[in-house]
């Protein structure tokens, strides 16, 4: 493979050569076994094409600062084709097997959808060649139904039939690409599938339309023989004020309302969880409990900032708890950990792209190590079992097994004094649990 970057391939070095980040992985050792599986199998890391190849590091108040070697190509198609080479070398040097992309990440649009598809197919042809050459894989692909001005009021939920038709045609071609590249999953993120005001919105009709749209998408996938897992990615707001896939619970309710729960799982992002007022681990738990945990977009936000900043993950506490949920789920099946993340605006060099991905991979690898030890020692399991132990016998078991009515429950407690009711409760020992979690993090990672 040609050398486009003056950086060495990232390998596992542990902490023996010092603690400064950047020379290799301190915690991510791809072939090391964790609970009987290689770390690389638990952590199917993926590089996001849009942030890595296309992101200019703009913010709402300033132009982009990113300095990228492919900027030397002035012709849009020439640059698009060159980016494929840069992307695959980046994957190789980062020791990452997977990548993800939107259709519009790959190639410039033409004046018509036919022209746009032709541009896209040229780039996909090259991607397929590089995949065959390198063995790299597509974790998931998706379509951008939010960037172009035609999607001013949404794609599948647009109040304009022509735009809904265009959205369907764009998804159709994107699904055909998914089959060509053997994409393991196909993601729907409703960037503008929501509303700004109820004053001009038929909310019920829009949700019925997007449900119909999803059924049609699945029907077409079946028709062409594409078998990848369909995923929905929740987000509460931005760019719209109210998005229909607000959070995991709302999205699951939507899927069940419209009979889509057998065809879809969830792709959950850390920063989106914050915007919804939840922790990342909460969203993962909700999906896991529903049997609909599909994949993870590994990023984080700033809890002091109220918008989506897509920062590379560095919070070991959060990573540990998310990995704990993933292990409890038995892994992510066809899903993985896609870095839907970008360096900070002041981190504008190519070196920063390598360092940021290294940091994110090490953070989740460290979290996986701690989570595995927590599970092995049954730290939380034993506490939870004891906390709910009153439902194993007596009136609790009767309640659990549907053997009592409200009247019988009333008879049981009607004459119990307050002192007995208080005595039946137990301390949650939350401070002790949080401190224990800290101790596991310090101890496991200190080895």
From Swiss-Prot:
Subcellular compartments: Cytoplasm
Keywords of this entry: Carbohydrate metabolism, Cytoplasm, Isomerase, Magnesium, Metal-binding, Xylose metabolism
Cystine connections: none
Names of the cofactor(s): Mg(2+)
Family: Belongs to the xylose isomerase family.
Biological source species: Pediococcus pentosaceus (strain ATCC 25745 / CCUG 21536 / LMG 10740 / 183-1w)
Binding site for Mg(2+) 1: 233, 269, 297, 340
Subunit details: Homotetramer.
Listed EC numbers: 5.3.1.5
Enzyme kind, highest EC tier: isomerase
GO BP: D-xylose metabolic process
Record: residues binding Mg(2+) 2: 269, 272, 308, 310
Higher taxonomy: Bacteria, Bacillati, Bacillota, Bacilli, Lactobacillales
Protein name: Xylose isomerase
């Amino acid at each position: 493979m040609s050398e486009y970057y003056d950086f060495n391939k990232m390998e596992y070095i542990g902490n023996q050569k010092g603690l400064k980040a950047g020379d290799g992985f301190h915690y991510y050792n791809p072939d090391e076994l964790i609970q009987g599986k290689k770390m690389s199998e638990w952590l199917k890391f993926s590089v996001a094409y849009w942030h890595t190849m296309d992101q200019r590091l703009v913010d709402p108040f300033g132009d982009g600062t990113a300095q990228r070697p492919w900027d030397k190509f002035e012709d849009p198609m020439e640059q698009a084709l060159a980016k494929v080479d840069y992307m695959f070398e980046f994957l190789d040097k980062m020791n990452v097997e997977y990548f993800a992309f939107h259709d519009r990440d790959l190639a410039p649009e033409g004046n018509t959808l036919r022209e746009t598809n032709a541009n896209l197919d040229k780039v996909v042809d090259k991607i397929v060649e590089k995949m065959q050459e390198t063995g790299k894989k597509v974790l998931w692909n998706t379509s951008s139904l939010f960037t172009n001005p035609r999607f001013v009021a949404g794609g599948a939920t647009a109040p304009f039939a022509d735009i809904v038709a265009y959205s369907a045609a764009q998804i159709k071609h994107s699904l055909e690409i998914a089959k060509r590249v053997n994409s393991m999953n196909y993601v729907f993120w409703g960037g503008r599938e929501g509303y700004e005001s109820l004053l001009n919105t038929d909310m019920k009709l829009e949700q019925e339309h997007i449900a119909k749209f999803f059924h049609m998408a699945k029907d077409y996938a079946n028709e062409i023989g594409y078998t990848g897992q369909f995923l929905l990615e929740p987000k509460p707001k931005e760019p719209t004020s109210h998005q229909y896939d607000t959070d995991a619970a709302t999205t699951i309710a939507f899927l069940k309302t419209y009979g889509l729960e057998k065809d879809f799982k969830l792709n959950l992002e850390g920063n989106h969880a914050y915007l919804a007022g939840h922790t990342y681990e909460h969203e993962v738990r909700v999906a896991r409990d529903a049997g609909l945990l599909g994949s993870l977009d590994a990023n984080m936000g700033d809890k002091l900032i109220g918008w989506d900043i897509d920062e590379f993950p560095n919070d070991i506490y959060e990573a540990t708890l998310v990995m704990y949920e993933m292990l409890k789920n038995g892994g992510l099946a066809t899903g993985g950990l896609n870095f839907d993340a970008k360096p900070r605006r002041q981190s504008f060099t190519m070196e920063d792209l390598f360092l940021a991905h290294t940091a994110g991979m090490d953070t989740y690898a460290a979290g996986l190590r701690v989570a595995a030890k927590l599970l092995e020692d049954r730290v939380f399991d034993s506490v939870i079992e004891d906390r709910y132990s009153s439902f194993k016998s007596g009136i609790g078991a009767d309640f659990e097994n549907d053997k009592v009515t409200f009247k019988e429950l009333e008879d049981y407690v009607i004459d119990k004094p307050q002192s007995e009711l208080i005595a039946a409760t137990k301390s949650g020992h939350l401070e002790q649990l949080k401190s224990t979690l800290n101790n596991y993090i310090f101890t496991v990672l200190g080895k």
